[in-house]
């Protein structure tokens, strides 16, 4: 059977925006990697309903810069930027260097693969039918100007005893064309019957 390679990893040389961590290290690589993982998990857990698409960590010798891409930037910033200050203080304790936090708004959340996958998982956890959730996501995505989309759900769908995979695809999705800008995301929905995996591919354009 043919397997699907992660489209982001496949295009690392071409799409430089795919890197989540922009830094290099020698001896303390392990320590910095664990710091990055902590930063991402802390931000994602603290702002579950802020529509966070991506958390990028950039480092210099003296500064750690955290860029949060969100569809609801106001939720993260808070009143007079108080929530951002809390994030800075929490990260600074772990990193032990000066921290800068920037919040960037995501203009079209309907085209963002991460936000689509999270939206579907929330619906599945609320016991909404996977077919209905997938069709709605595809409809909204194509309305906002995407050239193609594929959504896949795997697991005990609808509480069935035997796990299966269901998927829907609309428009063009050239996975083998390297210049094609394809966004990909994977998310897990924790339901009563077990975990359901949700995969989303979005073809934005070349």
Curated annotation (Swiss-Prot):
It comes from the Bacteria. Keywords: Ribonucleoprotein, Ribosomal protein, RNA-binding, rRNA-binding. GO terms for molecular function: mRNA binding; rRNA binding; structural constituent of ribosome. Residues 39-107 form the KH type-2 domain. The keyword RNA-binding applies. One of its GO terms (cellular component) is cytosolic small ribosomal subunit. One of its GO terms (biological process) is translation. PROSITE patterns: KH_TYPE_2, RIBOSOMAL_S3. Pfam families: KH_2 (PF07650), Ribosomal_S3_C (PF00189). Part of the 30S ribosomal subunit. Forms a tight complex with proteins S10 and S14. HAMAP family: Ribosomal_uS3_B. Binds the lower part of the 30S subunit head. Binds mRNA in the 70S ribosome, positioning it for translation. Belongs to the universal ribosomal protein uS3 family. This is Small ribosomal subunit protein uS3. It comes from Wolbachia pipientis subsp. Culex pipiens (strain wPip).
């Amino acid at each position: 059977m043919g397997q699907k390679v992660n489209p982001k990893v496949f295009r690392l040389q071409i799409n430089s925006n795919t890197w989540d961590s922009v830094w290099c290290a020698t001896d303390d690589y392990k320590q910095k990697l664990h710091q990055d993982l902590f930063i991402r998990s802390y931000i994602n857990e603290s702002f579950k309903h802020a529509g966070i698409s991506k958390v990028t960590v950039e480092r210099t010798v003296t500064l750690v810069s955290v860029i949060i891409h969100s569809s609801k930037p106001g939720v993260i910033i808070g009143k007079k930027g108080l929530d951002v200050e809390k994030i800075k203080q929490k990260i600074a304790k772990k990193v032990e260097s000066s921290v800068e936090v920037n919040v960037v708004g995501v203009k079209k959340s309907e085209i963002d693969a991460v936000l689509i996958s999270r939206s579907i998982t929330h619906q599945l956890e609320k016991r909404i039918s996977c077919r209905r959730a997938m069709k709605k996501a595809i409809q909204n995505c194509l309305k906002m100007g995407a050239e193609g989309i594929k959504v896949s759900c795997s697991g005990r769908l609808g509480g069935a005893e035997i796990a299966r995979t269901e998927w829907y695809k609309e428009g063009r999705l050239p996975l083998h064309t390297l210049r094609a800008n394809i966004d990909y995301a994977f998310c897990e929905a924790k339901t009563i019957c077990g975990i359901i995996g949700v995969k989303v591919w979005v073809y934005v354009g070349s």
